[in-house]
From Swiss-Prot:
HAMAP family: Cytosol_peptidase_M17 (MF_00181)
Residues the entry annotates as binding Mn(2+) 2: K269, D274, D292, E353
Positions with a binding annotation for Mn(2+) 1: D274, D351, E353
Any Gene Ontology CC annotation: cytoplasm
Alphabetical list of InterPro entries matching this protein: Leucine_aapep/pepB (IPR011356), Macro_dom-like (IPR043472), Peptidase_M17_C (IPR000819), Peptidase_M17_leu_NH2_pept (IPR023042), Peptidase_M17_N (IPR008283)
Protein name as catalogued: Probable cytosol aminopeptidase
EC number: 3.4.11.1, 3.4.11.10
Any GO molecular function: metalloaminopeptidase activity
Organism of derivation: Aliivibrio fischeri (strain MJ11)
Record: active site: K281, R355
Highest classification ranks of the organism: Bacteria, Pseudomonadati, Pseudomonadota, Gammaproteobacteria, Vibrionales
Residue ranges that the Swiss-Prot or TrEMBL entry lists as coiled coil: none
Reaction(s) the record says it catalyses: Release of an N-terminal amino acid, Xaa-|-Yaa-, in which Xaa is preferably Leu, but may be other amino acids including Pro although not Arg or Lys, and Yaa may be Pro. Amino acid amides and methyl esters are also readily hydrolyzed, but rates on arylamides are exceedingly low; Release of an N-terminal amino acid, preferentially leucine, but not glutamic or aspartic acids
Gene giving rise to this polypeptide: pepA
Length: 502
């Protein structure tokens, strides 16, 4: 689909359809009022008749409105004007796209980007309209033998901005939105892939393909033989029960004017299937453990968006690919592992495996002398209990970095919430036989997991995002969400100084 921005009066638009808002109760938005005036009160007369109340998501398609050049006018219910917030705005955009496709419109001029959304500017409204549109059109049906035929005639969407001064800002918002949407789609596709296809080698192949597609990206793969030489015993232990080789895929993006500038490092947990190992999970819902690689998928998506945006940064993306399976060769509860850092870990539960993979990845990236490190993982069910399915958990050893990420989460709408990491929580990881256990009991499970990782991130500024509750949705519409790609890319945009410059 082609996106563009323009600034103009609604009555002068020659298009298949003009999209304008209506508030409750039957109140025309400023743009709709202009159309109503030109049409001699035609639209307001329909509202007085009760054809549209203005409730969120209500739609009314008008044909041949008097004195209007466009073929049709789509009235979109936006709820109460003062209550129009971010979530409702995105939902309205998605519903609008669905309706435009259902009505057969090939092009449309959308004035919803001129609505007032609390605390948001034109850049945000245009970018979110692009991201929401792309999200609403996403499908994953490549494994269906009979693919459903979906009617999608809409090919061109123009967003109107209030003044010509904002055209450049709108164009930048479209470019950013398309790049982020591309990264989100890549992340969703990886997450939704079945585990018999998306194994660690598949993650590696996608990382190589990214390097093939962009000159700014180089990729190297570390397999089990090299991991042994590096002393990544903890990482290797998790995957030793699977016939699929563990692979750590490293993508290096160099866009900074100084190629030696310290990089930002992103690490994603890539458990392509997590059965729990010897501490096996219940069978109900185990199919969703293919999503345990969504941390890696989000890092891959962020790297793809970064390459498309061509930001002036150096960034390293690490996909920590592995599979946790039960077998006669699996690691066991009671095993003591010596990590790459030299610290020892008593395995108390083989289903707390993500941290055992990440700890060696965190040690490995010390060689880059990073500006900062952010790891992303579907790490703990405790995070779902604490924050539900709407907000990711955040833990950090550096207040400014944590504030940057929280700010990026608010800007992008891909929200995170910082959890504490006090010394008292570290005491729960004590082991009588090793430097630490790999779990800290039932209490504060997300925090103790973060405390565990922090022991391997002492040489740089570090943050951990737990996306266990936000990386996918269950039920009839189950699937990967692509989160937190938007948060990560916003963080990188902010670091580059290009977040919403005109």
């Amino acid at each position: 689909m082609e996106f563009s921005v323009k600034s103009g009066s609604p009555e002068k638009q020659r298009s298949a359809c003009i999209v304008v808002g209506v508030f409750e109760p039957r109140r025309l938005s400023p743009i709709a009022e202009q159309l109503d005036k030109i049409s001699g009160g035609y639209i307001s007369s329909l509202l007085r008749r009760g054809d549209l109340e203005g409730k969120p998501g209500q739609m009314l398609l008008l044909h041949q409105v008097p004195n209007i050049l466009s073929e049709r006018v789509l009235l979109v219910g936006c709820g109460k004007e003062r209550e129009l917030g971010e979530r409702q705005y995105k939902d309205i955009i998605k519903k609008t796209i669905s309706t435009l496709n259902e009505t057969g419109s090939m092009e449309a001029v959308c004035f919803l980007t001129e609505l007032h959304v609390k605390g948001r500017d034109t850049y945000w409204k245009v970018r979110q309209a692009v991201e929401s549109t792309k999200d609403s059109l996403y499908t994953f049906n490549q494994f269906k033998s009979n693919k459903p035929e979906t009617r999608r005639p809409l090919r061109k969407l123009v967003f109107n901005v209030p003044t010509r001064r904002e055209l450049n800002l709108g164009e930048k918002a479209i470019a950013h939105g398309l790049s982020i949407a591309s990264g989100v789609k890549a992340s969703k596709d990886l997450g939704n892939m079945p585990p018999n296809v998306a194994n660690p080698a598949y993650l590696a192949s996608q990382a190589r393909r990214l390097a093939d597609d962009y000159e700014t990206v180089t990729t190297k793969i570390i397999g089990e033989e090299e991991m042994k030489k590096l002393g990544m015993t903890s990482y290797l232990a998790v995957g030793q029960g699977s016939h699929n080789e563990s692979m750590m895929s490293i993508m290096e993006y160099k866009g900074h004017p100084d190629p030696t500038a310290k990089p930002i490092v992103l690490i994603g947990k890539g458990l392509t299937f997590d059965s729990g190992g010897i501490s096996i999970k219940p069978s109900e819902g185990m199919d969703e453990m293919k999503y345990d690689m969504c941390g890696a998928a989000s890092v891959f998506g962020a790297m793809k968006a970064l390459a498309k945006l061509n930001l002036p940064l150096n960034v390293v993306g690490v996909l920590a690919g592995c599979e946790n399976m039960p077998s006669s060769n699996s690691y066991r509860p009671g095993d003591i592992l010596t990590t790459m850092s030299g610290q020892t870990v008593e395995v108390l539960n083989t289903d707390a495996e993500g941290r055992l993979v990440l700890c060696d990845a965190l040690t490995y990236v010390e060689r880059y002398e990073p500006e900062c490190v952010v790891d992303v993982a579907t790490l703990t069910g405790a995070c779902v209990v604490a924050l539900g399915h709407h907000i990711s958990g955040l833990i950090s050893n550096h207040n400014p970095l944590a504030h940057e990420l929280i700010n990026a989460s608010e800007q992008s709408g891909d929200r995170a919430w910082r959890l504490p990491m006090a010394e008292e929580y570290n005491e729960q990881l004590s082991s009588p036989f090793a430097d630490m256990g790999n779990i800290g009991g039932k209490a504060a499970g997300t925090i103790t997991a973060g405390c565990f990782l922090s022991r391997f991130a002492k040489k740089y500024h570090w943050a951990h995002i737990d996306s266990a509750g936000t990386a996918w949705v269950s039920g009839a519409n189950k699937g990967s969400t692509g989160r937190p790609v938007s948060l990560l890319v916003q963080f990188l945009l902010n670091r580059s100084g290009q977040e919403n410059e005109e």
